[in-house]
Amino acid sequence: MSVDEKPIKIKVEKVSKIFGKQTKKAVQMLANGKTKKEILKATGSTVGVNQADFEVYDGEIFVIMGLSGSGKSTLVRMLNRLIEPTAGNIYIDGDMITNMSKDQLREVRRKKISMVFQKFALFPHRTILENTEYGLELQGVDKQERQQKALESLKLVGLEGFEHQYPDQLSGGMQQRVGLARALTNDPDILLMDEAFSALDPLIRKDMQDELLDLHDNVGKTIIFITHDLDEALRIGDRIVLMKDGNIVQIGTPEEILMNPSNEYVEKFVEDVDLSKVLTAGHIMKRAETVRIDKGPRVALTLMKNLGISSIYAVDKQKKLLGVIYASDAKKAAESDLSLQDILNTEFTTVPENTYLTEIFDVVSDANIPIAVVDEKQRMKGIVVRGALIGALAGNNEYINAEGTNEQTQDPSAQEVK
């Protein structure tokens, strides 16, 4: 399903937050294009968020990032009205939450939205299980039911067996998992995560990012993730919002942010990113010419001659990759009346589309033929050649497929290892 076909989970329309007294005047000045500094000087009020406008799709990991003071935490707290918007509207599943009563809002917070903060805020005198079930306890849920749900959530985050421990017996990373489990116990549609991993050591932080991605694959929640770390945003986000001084300066996929920055600020923000840890084989693969295994060696020879290559991948009728045919072997087979199956070489390397370039650099460098890119059914999707890998790592857009898939016809010469 394409992004455009996914149902909209959250819709934010021209939402602003003004801190101060002259909010109406400040909102009008924003509408007239005045800057944050101009509004502060004229009204004494501070612009926290300026006319934010975006949609979040169901099941998406939507990252809001920016430096300190950019407005990202203010924005996420307006999504559940922990901070009241000064202007604009917010919809969840089509329901406008900005005009809900306290009772209606309380119901939304209980059933649809949970929040995970940077500080774990666990009760030291309660066990891990008791901390995890606390939200359901406040709702008056039966003890047996809430403990069962809490145990299921702890299992999801890898803490099965720790339910009778106390917070001070757990590491920082494990405590943050408890916070995540507590949020999941309510079975919300939406998780708001505000700098949830920022206080953790780098190695633990990466583990938690992996845990979050695995969890997302398993339960499919819509996640709004706040961070100031670009590497973290690029690693986990389906789409990223970049903020500065309360303004949204760009919204896009990680690839769009990296390869097509909207202005100089974004360009500087991403200039030091290690592309090898962001781009994948799918971003640089080219269309692969192949030969069906049921064709004869003369067909394979003709294809290779026309393409100017010395080897070609062989596939079956379903495009499943079977092996490599070398020109020298095909020539001998044609002279000896052998089939392609008789000369099929099955010693070759494949990589999935989502393999990061940092993981395939050595493989591509050592290979004497292009590396085959395959899907989960071992069907041929494309090839990676050395020249494209080097060009992409150098930041040359010519070698990068915008959406991480190969949609363009390749120059046959690209089949050769260069």
Swiss-Prot record:
ATP binds at residues 66-73. It is an enzyme of class 7 (translocase). Pfam families: ABC_tran, CBS. Residues 34-270 form the ABC transporter domain. Its EC number is 7.6.2.9. GO terms for molecular function: ABC-type quaternary ammonium compound transporting activity; ATP binding; ATP hydrolysis activity. It comes from the Bacteria. GO terms for cellular component: membrane. It catalyses: a quaternary ammonium(out) + ATP + H2O = a quaternary ammonium(in) + ADP + phosphate + H(+). PROSITE patterns: ABC_TRANSPORTER_1, ABC_TRANSPORTER_2, CBS. InterPro entries: AAA+_ATPase, ABC_osmolyte_uptake_ATP-bind, ABC_transporter-like_ATP-bd, ABC_transporter-like_CS, CBS_dom, CBS_dom_sf, Gly-betaine_transp_ATP-bd, P-loop_NTPase. SUPFAM superfamilies: CBS-domain pair (SSF54631), P-loop containing nucleoside triphosphate hydrolases (SSF52540). Keywords: Amino-acid transport, ATP-binding, CBS domain, Nucleotide-binding, Repeat, Translocase, Transport. GO terms for biological process: amino acid transport; glycine betaine transport. CDD domains: ABC_Pro_Gly_Betaine (cd03294). Residues 284-340, 344-403 form the CBS domain. Belongs to the ABC transporter superfamily. The complex is composed of two ATP-binding proteins (OpuAA), two transmembrane proteins (OpuAB) and a solute-binding protein (OpuAC). PANTHER family: GLYCINE BETAINE/PROLINE BETAINE TRANSPORT SYSTEM ATP-BINDING PROTEIN PROV (PTHR43869), GLYCINE BETAINE_PROLINE BETAINE TRANSPORT SYSTEM ATP-BINDING PROTEIN PROV (PTHR43869:SF1). NCBIfam families: proV. This is Glycine betaine transport ATP-binding protein OpuAA. The lineage of its organism: Bacteria, Bacillati, Bacillota, Bacilli, Bacillales.
